Amino acid sequence: MSRIAALPDHLVNQIAAGEVVERPANALKEIVENSIDAGATAIEVELAGGGIRLIRVSDNGGGIHPDDIELALHRHATSKIKTLNDLEHVASMGFRGEGLASIASVSRLTLTSRQNDSSHATQVKAEDGKLSSPTAAAHPVGTTIEAAELFFNTPARRKFLKSENTEYAHCATMLERLALAHPHIAFSLKRDGKQVFKLPAQSLHERIAAIVGEDFQTASLGIDSGNGALRLYGAIAKPTFAKGKTDKQYCFVNHRFVRDKVMLHAVKQAYRDVLHNALTPAFVLFLDLPPEAVDVNVHPTKTEIRFRDSQQVHQLVFHTLNKALADTRANLTESVGNAGEVLHDITGVVSTPMPSENDSENLFDSVSNYPTGNKSDTHNAFGSSGKTAPMPYQSAYAPQQRSLSLRESRAAMNTYAELYKKTDDIDLELSRFEQARFGNMPSETPAPQTDTPLSDGIPSQSELPPLGFAIAQLLGIYILAQAEDSLLLIDMHAAAERVNYEKMKRQRQENGNLQSQRLLIPVTFAASHEECAALADYAETLAGFGLELSDMGGNTLAVRAVPAMLGKADVVSLAKDVLNELAQVGSSQTIEEHENRILATMSCHGSIRAGRRLTLPEMNALLRDMENTPRSNQCNHGRPTWVKLTLKELDALFLRGQ
């Protein structure tokens, strides 16, 4: 039987390197973090062969004392901590003393460093675990570390590396994260001798724009909130900017990039009311807290952490983001161009870009190449086969509702008119607005003479509602509205769904329960065993949602009361859907966690259905509701409620001004 023996230090370092240095990007991270801890204000990175052939990092930090330069390449040698108490309060990026030793054991490493009070630099080399004697060298104040031929002595590890392009991409991403976390430091990157980027010391606002992109910066909401010793700040993207990828998600804890389940779950919860399930939010979040409140000594790469009070962190992140998103209401800052990107992320269909003034020669080619779908897409919005032209992206936008009969439509016609008694004046305001906008155009009928100047009663641009005024209804699905220099298209079902949803949430928060309305004649329906069980378990909960059901026996349930604001909904479908939602509540989930989903389901049943014809006052009342409703840019499922076509974009379609 083999005897137990101590492993040689070089082998121990190579084993440790398997945890710390998985690929060139990890080696780059360890070296750059040392530069940050050294107080550098400028860091230059050069890569060759994707970081496999060479990683060179130069900084202008404090440097290493000549007597310590050999020790810097020994395992567990560090200047960051000396006691266990120091470890619990560590604020530096590195602290274990494993990084350089691990890199030196699997590469040909050269370390050159000079302190401010030294007349020359000191250089030491390491190859295959063997250190050379320190020698004098020429070097400015600071440190340069070169790691060449990574994994040259561990071919089994090297064969697991990807292509040079892939490894470079990982290195560039790693450096961008470090640059984003430390905007006060200038960063530069060269790849195979060519400059990739050069970032000066910047403000956080400027660094976010440089790394994440100007498009993110334009579509983001700034946040800055605190709770005791915790501070959360940064930027989160509006839901309309959401993508199908997670490449624009950054979480930093004490300026260290992390992948933390607590923070990510809080972000997901904050966006769940406004984001389509096929999309992911974009954000750059910085959480500052005392070092003793977080344990970073959990994973060799330090990307996983553990909070002392994770509930406090979750609440801070969720409430901060939820409040910022709730403050977003319908306005005229979104455009149909961004909606096309959203549709591409949801459906995978590439939309045709809006032509610019210089693209007139390609306009008709773009129209002819516009996606028309297959035969199955030629069904119209009412679910039957029609002769109308197929509508691109109909599957992404079409409300998943059956069309109403004429009798049902008439019965529900006055919903919004009852809520807004003064909407009769909207038609007059609209006509005045049109006169102001197009009053100089020739008219076949002379305008009547009046002693009152026309401008006295015309709303100015500042008085116009953000979503303008409705002018027509399209295909029983969309509302066309005219605003200043733009045409708006509103999905009436999606918009009404959000309005009803927020009203029910507000009523539930203020009163604890939704007001119910008893049915004159109870409606019975055949139920499944699961639905009957859900009623037995959650009858009291249903009452809180304004639903009163009773078990008639024989798997038959009766609906006796429904929420007052949903009085005209299909009560059977409403009851069955809510029961199904409740049936999904398991032992690890509570009603509170499902509450918004239940309210969203209920609001869907009480919203305007496809095929219902609205009057202008009803359409305008819905627009005013949207302007006063939080998160009204998206429906409960995260789909856009409206898009905008500017006058310039409309002119381009007709080659005006070409």
Curated annotation (Swiss-Prot):
**Which domain of life does this protein belong to?**
Bacteria
* A biological-process GO annotation: mismatch repair
A Pfam family of this chain: HATPase_c_3
Species assigned in the record: Neisseria meningitidis serogroup B (strain ATCC BAA-335 / MC58)
Q: Read off the PROSITE patterns from this record.
A: DNA_MISMATCH_REPAIR_1
TM region positions: none
Record CDD domains: HATPase_MutL-MLH-PMS-like, MutL_Trans_MutL
Indicate what this protein is called per its UniProt record.
DNA mismatch repair protein MutL
Ranges of Polar residues composition bias in the record: 442-456
Record-linked HAMAP family = DNA_mis_repair
To which protein family does this belong?
A: Belongs to the DNA mismatch repair MutL/HexB family.
What GO molecular function annotation could you give as one example from this UniProt entry? ATP hydrolysis activity
Q: Which PANTHER family match?
A: DNA MISMATCH REPAIR PROTEIN MLH, PMS, MUTL, DNA MISMATCH REPAIR PROTEIN MLH1
Q: What does this protein do?
A: This protein is involved in the repair of mismatches in DNA. It is required for dam-dependent methyl-directed DNA mismatch repair. May act as a 'molecular matchmaker', a protein that promotes the formation of a stable complex between two or more DNA-binding proteins in an ATP-dependent manner without itself being part of a final effector complex.
GO cellular component terms? mismatch repair complex
